[in-house]
Amino acid sequence: MPSSVNRTSRTEPAGHHREFPLSLAAIDELVAEEEAEDARVLHLTANETVLSPRARAVLASPLTSRYLLEHLDMRGPSPARLGNLLLRGLDRIGTIEESATEVCRRLFGARYAEFRCLSGLHAMQTTFAALSRPGDTVMRVATKDGGHFLTELICRSFGRRSCTYVFDDTMTIDLERTREVVEKERPSLLFVDAMNYLFPFPIAELKAIAGDVPLVFDASHTLGLIAGGRFQDPLREGADLLQANTHKTFFGPQKGIILGNDRSLMEELGYTLSTGMVSSQHTASTVALLIALHEMWYDGREYAAQVIDNARRLAGALRDRGVPVVAEERGFTANHMFFVDTRPLGSGPAVIQRLVRAGVSANRAVAFNHLDTIRFGVQEITRRGYDHDDLDEAADLVAAVLLERQEPERIRPRVAELVGRRRTVRYTGDPASAAGPPARERYAPPTAPAGHPARPRWIGVRLTPLPEPVTEAECAGAQRLGRLAGAFPHQIDSSGNVSFTSTDGRLFVTGSGTYIKDLAPGDFVELTGAEGWTLHCRGDGPPSAEAYLHHLLRERVGARYVVHNHCIPGRALETSGALVIPPKEYGSVALAEAVADACQDSQVMYVRRHGLVFWAHSYDECLALIEDVRRITG
């Protein structure tokens, strides 16, 4: 049985002895020591970055304790809504997010942006969950060819099979042999997920092979270069989605991002996130990401060009000093990282140990068909402003360690001296962008136009008891429609709402929090009329948040049956005949009025990021509409 009493650390430096649990003062001391050592290290890892002071400061903001929920399209002004949960919102952060979405359009050519992913792996899991099903096959990059070491495991844990691209001897995908694998394995998703690579991928050619199958490019390593117009341009070259973590060449916090131009794919991803993959998106980290996006907008082109120049220069300088660098004949690299072949230098772990003793941080990586290497990256020292002289000095120090010309401990003070000269973070955005009045003066809540009464966000409800509940016979048709609509594929959940008009002309709608797949007579509330912005209702509890929508459809077109589910029709939408309505806030007057305005033109409507709405004058007509769309959507 494990013991938690009087445990001592096994990782303390010589001369230190601590007992657990630590005192808070001891924790403060350890953090301070770690930070001090970090400031003396030459960071040449390819998978880390340094934040700007502005982005780092917001991580300690009081906002870190506040919730930022849902996608921007669905959040609405404060108070924010998540289903039936209402809470004070962060409207000013929404303004920043709206600006960051525009930045993504300009930097990446992406019409849609999803900032809620907590990490790159979380983005990968979201993509797998949204765009494939258990038993499907996902095509990935094999670990031996530079693929991420967890992709295959995540495929298995999600119940997916996997197959791999075929690479040739030049670290390049063999397109013809890969085509053969695709034709044999028929993957439902092509995922380009490399973590050890030097040159662009043939995205356009892979998309030609993929056809209608989604192609997802994971740019966790090169997102900052892509933002700066370098390396490659995945979305314009044919990738359906671009996803990444945001803390390598992209100089943001440890978060994830998904970008794309296909509305249906992005909405499927958004719904997948909203239905169990994320609640809080970690407010402070999200704001730091939004800041980094703006910094990249201002300085990304200069930064990306300098990163690639520095990577090639440092690789060449090491080669000139006798260090075996991979891919010399191809110019070493086209991105931020390069690889040293450890075979002439000793085992990879031993080489890394020497570097760490000298105060140099890098990664050992087994890649390129099992080649043991040390992976170096220059994105952090580039942001620190290292110039050619600094790179030559760094090459002297690293080569001396790799080639064992000096003991690492003798090199360590020289490394610390070099690092100490370059502490300022560069590429932090246009200084003029910070000018202007403070945010509290710039922000103003939306107001109604002069002379017009303010339209409320939500309809009011006046509830009285229902003398007699709905009978089984009266609601039988609505129950059957609810079961059918609630069982659609790609369904966010089995909630939603249904209304029907009884034979004596009374309008009934499902109550708040009911599930349309298993409705009972007691789940219905009668709508007896409306007065201004208030619905008069009779029932045991409040009606659905969308009750006003049902009231308006009854008033506008005489609808006797209305069914609203939470289905994402995806790409099948184009052939379903549904009229598409832009995203509107759940339960809002704006949503109800948008649907009521559109119902004159169609009996099937899709509210983006929300679900389908059907209306009809009879049960049989509504049943036929639902069955037709269900056949189309699978």
From Swiss-Prot:
Modified residues (N6-(pyridoxal phosphate)lysine): K248
Keywords of this entry: Pyridoxal phosphate, Transferase
Top EC class, one word: transferase
Domain of life of the native organism: Bacteria
SUPFAM superfamilies per the UniProt record, alphabetical: AraD/HMP-PK domain-like, PLP-dependent transferases
Record bears the keyword Transferase: yes
One Pfam family, short name: Aldolase_II
InterPro entries, per the entry: Aldolase_II/adducin_N, Aldolase_II/adducin_N_sf, F_threo_transal, PyrdxlP-dep_Trfase, PyrdxlP-dep_Trfase_major, PyrdxlP-dep_Trfase_small, Ser_HO-MeTrfase-like, SHMT-like_dom
GO cellular component: cytoplasm
GO molecular function: fluorothreonine transaldolase activity; glycine hydroxymethyltransferase activity; pyridoxal phosphate binding
Region entry Disordered, spans: 428-456
Reactions listed under catalytic activity: fluoroacetaldehyde + L-threonine = 4-fluoro-L-threonine + acetaldehyde
UniProt-annotated binding residues for pyridoxal 5'-phosphate: Y67, H221, H247, R375
GO terms of biological process kind: glycine biosynthetic process from serine; tetrahydrofolate metabolic process
EC number: 2.2.1.8
SMART domains: Aldolase_II (SM01007)
Cofactor dependency: pyridoxal 5'-phosphate
UniProt similarity note: Belongs to the SHMT family.
Entry function: Transaldolase that catalyzes the final step in 4-fluorothreonine biosynthesis. Mediates a L-threonine/fluoroaceldehyde to 4-fluoro-L-threonine/acetaldehyde crossover reaction. Can also convert chloroacetaldehyde into 4-chloro-L-threonine. Does not use glycine as a substrate.
NCBIfam families: F_threo_transal
Listed name of the protein: Fluorothreonine transaldolase
Species per Swiss-Prot/TrEMBL record: Streptantibioticus cattleyicolor (Streptomyces cattleya)
